[in-house]
Amino acid sequence: MALVIGFALVFWAIRAIGSSGGEGFYAVLSHNAMVAIFAPAFLLPLVSVAISLRRFWAEVGGKPLQLSDLMSAFKRAGKMQDLAAGHGEGCNFQDEDRFSHGRRHIHHAIMYGFLLCFASTSVATVMHYGFGLHAPYGFWSLPKLFGVSGGILLTVGCGAMVLLKQKSDRELGDPSAWGGDIGFILLLGFVGLSGLVLYALGATSVMPALLAIHLGSVLTFFLLMPYTKMAHGFYRLAALIRDAQRKRELSVGC
């Protein structure tokens, strides 16, 4: 929370310096300023994750990638197949003998919500630099459709995950990591929620303050990415790829 507030104040200070002009959000903070701040904040954490993944890959004896291994891993990840458990009844995450697919469905909402938000930014970048189509975009444009639907899934999914973790038995996991997990989920959900509020009130006088808060939360999320549970997505995908390699090797050996 301190980081979110701090970064929001930084953006507010940048806004006070002024903008070179533009429409919508760019009237508050120029496009070049956003790129200068967010490009390194996004790329440097990815470099950190890439270095650790390379070490992990060597540790587990990973082999050169094949398309079939990648397709198998992405298929399992997309379906959240392992959260259905081997018996297909879901996870027993509570202190009861009851299985549920709730955890799987909530993970689906968070993952696809995040991917839609990422797709929104990616499409907007291509439209801006590739086709000269600059923001703001209308509601029926791909950036808005991806962003709004992704923000809703992300907000609802993170809220449901917090409720689920409140009900779950903490002793089934690492109790010392529980607080960090909750903090990360709340931050990710706040990114989605603040984006939706910013879209809804983007034409009002509170837009500059909302923009500062939203961008501050996004920047915080990027910088903390290698040190939060967000990193488990990268490792999980790598583990699924290695598992696909092992299965292929066993089938060839037989």
Regions found by a protein language model. Name each.
Residues 1-254:
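Membrane-embedded alpha-helical bundles of multi-pass integral membrane proteins
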